[in-house]
């Protein structure tokens, strides 16, 4: 006689990002990268943070604050890509929740993180082509340094916010406002560096607006709408 009894199927628990060991590993890696970089390159990082908001007339080739070990530079850019990907993940989990019901969270998080270095490479290439065509080599070099230093600092400033979002589960409007505030400050700093580096005279304001909108705002808009379009297509197909 068969004595096996079938029980009622349980309801699956919702995905909790703070309980995912892979996410915890990524967060630990980010904290480790920032801690290691500050322990070795603190003087450079703080000096470059100051130069994001003031215009340095000239720099000395013997000034050691102008040089960073390329290993820490690459690690900090990698860290900024991870953190920016987490910010996109936080936004789209709230705005397109149905997508995360169809595709595993870690697959989407990995995809969003992977988009960032590709996007930054494309944007850097566009900046390089335009700057090489219209501006001097010295100014182009200074701009490239400022561009990546700003991206590095964006990742550093967003790290504590991402930790709060992941582990304290801050409500959606609050975390989006905080992240948005940091991003806006970064855009303002980038706008200022564009002006001080390439358009020092006030009559260049119109060209600055065209330059900034075409190479900074438009690519961001295309990235945003591109992710939304892909998300909608995935929802329809899955």
Indicate where each model-derived feature is located.
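Juxtamembrane boundary at the C-terminal end of a transmembrane helix
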Residues: 221-238
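Hydrophobic alpha-helical membrane-embedded segments
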Residues: 18-47, 118, 122
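Hydrophobic alpha-helical transmembrane segments and adjacent short intramembrane/lumenal linkers
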Residues: 135-223
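Cytosolic juxtamembrane amphipathic/interface segments immediately preceding
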Residues: 6-15, 56-72
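Alpha-helical transmembrane segments with an aromatic anchor "belt"
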Residues: 90-167
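Hydrophobic alpha-helical transmembrane segments and immediately flanking/interface helices
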Residues: 88-113, 175-197
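Long, highly hydrophobic alpha-helical transmembrane signal-anchor segments
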Residues: 1-26, 83-99
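Hydrophobic alpha-helical transmembrane segments of multi-pass integral membrane proteins
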Residues: 28-33, 73-91, 118, 122, ...
